[in-house]
Swiss-Prot record:
Source organism superkingdom: Eukaryota
Protein name: NAD(P)H-quinone oxidoreductase chain 4, chloroplastic
Cellular location(s): Plastid, Chloroplast thylakoid membrane
Lineage summary: Eukaryota, Viridiplantae, Streptophyta, Embryophyta, Tracheophyta
One Pfam family matching this protein: Proton_antipo_M
Annotated GO CC locations: chloroplast thylakoid membrane
Length: 500
């Protein structure tokens, strides 16, 4: 047990501090923005301090545990803790949310509500990654849906209500399966309900019941990840959302689904996961090729990037299904890597849209001359997206490749076939990425600037782009730092649940 409730402070600080936004002057947009930025920065510093001075990297067990009775009638406990699995996603959440606050600087309409929604979403995401209680995990999972819906429906494009409704129908519908699974595990085999992750992980269930639980959780996490065919909400959502919201969606929200697959499906339901792992790998391989092919046919810039996100999530699914140390480590690295790259691409797409007010490729062209700084950053981060050596995506995908090849759960021919399909997807990735760059930045200039103040990237936008680029290069050159955070936990999961 930890004496000071560091994690509780980290979880409740953003939404608590955000509530004071409504006491700020209604017309003071600058005050609102600076206040939100200070809250996010302070939260990130607090998280970094807590992890640096109170977290032991060589301990695979849950640390900084906080366990308090909350609602006695429902046996609902406030139970928080972190380990190697949640360390990276929590830091990613803080980093991307802080930069998304900077990206949202042009937003002026209902500024206080907009920034409060971002901070509420921040608390929900940190709470999901640090929960050690199934019911608390579900509550935090639902908490961040409401801000996302409002951010979509109030600050989106022309079809924002359609995309927001589609988002909430998919996610709220899948949450029913999540709730059924949570209640099923919590109420099974005991006079007193227990939702403790640690206790649930050491329970055994009848095979049929474990499979039912697994399917329920899989549906919930497949929508959020997303896994085909439950991905269709994502392109519409990204196509209509403000690009700061897209940064949060691509950088953090999708990663919550992958985190749930590891934390609950792998750790709590290992026998069912052994049964479903081959199907996950097949779906992951199909998803890589399908989404990459579909991305190539998209005329809308943000929808093309959205489908590229779906394609890259396929590597995470394959890594989770491989049931190897290397595969799972590669999946966790890809979660962090794509969190940065996806957020950066949506940010740069949004800054381009701010200048020309065009979102379709057939209306663009020749932008490299007008905005050379944005062109340079877009080119570098597109290279990171297509897994250029020296970038984080290359290392993550290579480790996933190694994980599937060395897996003892599958025969040689299926592994060769899966590897071949993955290779096809990796060939398609540079095709749609380079095509995107060509259509946007090369050729004849097909557009007219909507106003005479058309200018290149400013200091704020350069700062956001470079702040994301540096970790991408850092992870590509020295991935061992990030891998070392989760290596002990990964070995514990794989050895304890699959080779015992």
């Amino acid at each position: 047990m930890n004496d000071f409730p560091w994690l509780t402070l980290i979880v409740i600080f953003p939404i608590s501090a955000g509530s004071f936004l409504f006491f700020l002057p209604h017309r003071g947009n600058k005050v609102t923005k600076w206040y939100t930025l200070c809250v996010c920065s302070l939260e990130l510093l607090l998280t970094t301090y807590t992890f640096c001075y109170h977290f032991q990297l060589d301990d695979p067990l849950i640390q900084l545990v906080e366990d308090s009775k909350w609602i006695f009638f429902f046996h609902f406990d406030w139970r928080l803790g972190i380990d190697g699995l949640s360390f990276g996603p929590i830091l990613l959440t803080g980093f991307i949310t802080t930069l998304a606050t900077l990206a949202a600087w042009p937003v002026t309409r209902d500024s206080r509500l907009f920034h409060f929604m971002m901070l509420a979403m921040y608390s929900g995401q940190i709470g999901s990654f640090s929960s050690q209680d199934l019911l608390l995990f579900f509550m935090m999972w639902e908490l961040e849906l409401i801000p996302v819906y409002l951010l979509l429906s109030m600050w989106g494009g022309k079809k924002r209500l359609y995309s927001a409704t589609k988002f909430i129908l998919y996610t709220a519908g899948s949450s029913i399966f999540l709730l059924i699974g949570v209640l099923g595990i919590g109420l099974y085999g005991s006079n007193e309900p227990t939702f403790n992750f640690e206790i649930s992980a050491h329970r055994s269930y009848p095979a049929a019941l474990e499979i039912i639980f697994y399917i329920g959780f899989l549906i919930a996490f497949a929508v959020k990840s997303p896994i085909i065919p439950l991905h269709t909400w994502l392109p519409d959502t990204h196509g209509e959302a403000h690009y700061s919201t897209c940064m949060l969606l691509a950088g953090i929200l999708l990663k919550m689904g992958a985190y749930g697959l590891v934390r609950i499906n792998m750790e709590l339901l290992p026998h069912a996961h052994s049964i479903f792992a081959p199907y996950l790998i097949i779906v992951g391989a199909i998803q890589i090729v399908y989404a990459a092919s579909t991305s190539l046919g998209q005329r809308n810039l943000k929808k093309r990037i959205a489908y590229s996100s779906v394609s890259h999530m396929g590597f995470i699914i394959i890594g989770i299904g491989s049931i190897t140390d290397a595969g799972l480590s590669g999946a966790l690295l890809q979660i962090i890597s794509h969190g940065f790259i996806g957020a950066a691409l949506f940010f740069l797409a949004g800054t381009s849209y701010d200048r020309i007010r065009l979102g379709f490729f057939d209306e663009m062209g020749g932008m490299a001359v007008a905005i050379p700084k944005i062109f340079t950053m877009f080119s570098i981060l597109s290279m990171a997206s297509l897994a250029l050596p020296g970038m984080s995506g290359f290392v993550a995908e290579l480790i996933v490749f190694f994980g599937i090849i060395t897996s003892q759960k599958f025969l040689l021919m299926p592994k060769i076939l899966i590897t071949f399909v993955m290779a096809i997807g990796m060939i398609l990735t540079p095709i749609y990425s380079l095509s995107m760059l060509r259509q946007m930045f090369y050729g004849y200039r097909l557009f007219n600037a909507p106003n005479p103040s058309f200018f290149d990237s400013g200091p704020r936008e350069l700062f956001v782009s470079i702040s994301i680029l540096l970790p991408v290069i850092g992870m590509g050159i020295y991935p061992d730092f990030l891998l070392s955070l989760s290596v002990d936990k990964v070995e514990l999961i794989v050895s304890q649940f699959f080779y015992r």
